[in-house]
Curated annotation (Swiss-Prot):
Species the sequence originates in: Bacillus subtilis (strain 168)
The keyword Membrane is assigned to this record: yes
Gene symbol of the encoding locus: ywiC
A Pfam family annotated for this UniProt entry: YwiC
Name of the protein described by the UniProt record: Uncharacterized protein YwiC
Transmembrane regions: 4-24, 29-49, 61-81, 84-104, 116-136, 139-159, 180-200, 218-238
Record keywords, A-Z: Cell membrane, Membrane, Transmembrane, Transmembrane helix
Length: 239
């Protein structure tokens, strides 16, 4: 039986990088294991739900909802049992999940608003991870959430502008404008010299637009860019 696993590489980066940043800043603890496993299985569980809504038939995907949903509940319950306030992170994710379900039902899950909702959903993993490691909620959890959100919203803009919206000049201008502001927004939210983590994102949005590259090449470059972002942010938050 072939596992039903999402194939979006960008989503995997959004799943991992904010969580890792939160763990690096907060300090790794044993409770990060169930939290990460719960986070991972939650991501996997959303995929069959999305397909069921998109194709308007749930039966082919019910077993995968159970396979992924059961461990999701178990691992996240362990995390919440250890730190009950984490339940509020889950509550805050509900509107974002409903936005995703709405666009999946309309077979328009590539809409920019849905992308932004997805980015905020994933970046909350860094918020929870930092909170869990530090033991208290402080500005660093918000910092990791905001910086990760800025980065991955930019990635969504860029990828959409060179693939699905490559012939949409207006969308290109929106992407260029966002990436022009991106380093300044990062600094505004407290990044200091770590705004440098966003420079490659801005440069590739301006100079790589219009290149007739295969999707695989674009994906590889995005992974490299995400690794650079992770490295710079790790240096900044551990200084």
């Amino acid at each position: 039986m072939k596992a039903l696993i999402p194939k979006q590489h960008g989503a995997w980066a959004m799943l991992l990088i904010p969580f890792l940043l939160g763990m690096v800043k907060g300090g790794p603890v044993i409770w990060h294991i169930p939290l990460f496993l719960g986070w991972l299985f939650l991501y996997l569980a959303v995929y069959p739900v999305t397909l069921a809504l998109k194709k308007k038939q749930s039966k082919p995907y019910q077993k995968w909802m159970c396979y992924y949903g059961f461990p999701t509940c178990c691992f996240l319950m362990i995390s919440v049992f250890h730190k009950p306030p984490l339940i509020w992170v889950g509550v805050s994710l509900l509107p974002l999940f409903l936005i995703h379900m709405y666009f999946a039902r309309r077979k328009n899950e590539r809409a920019l608003l849905n992308d932004v909702a997805g980015v905020l959903f994933f970046c909350s993993g860094g918020f929870a991870s930092c909170w869990l490691g530090m033991g208290t909620l402080d500005g660093w959890a918000w910092f990791i959430f905001l910086q990760s959100a800025l980065f991955f919203i930019g990635s969504s803009f860029y990828v959409k502008s060179v693939i699905r919206e490559r012939k949409n000049r207006a969308f290109a201008y929106w992407s260029w404008g966002y990436h022009l502001l991106l380093p300044f927004l990062s600094a505004l939210f407290g990044a200091g010299w770590a705004f440098l983590a966003f420079i490659p994102s801005s440069l590739r949005a301006w100079f790589f637009h219009g290149r007739d590259w295969p999707v695989k090449t674009i994906g590889i470059l995005e992974i490299v860019n995400a690794c650079f972002f992770l490295a710079v942010m790790c240096l900044f938050i551990t200084r």
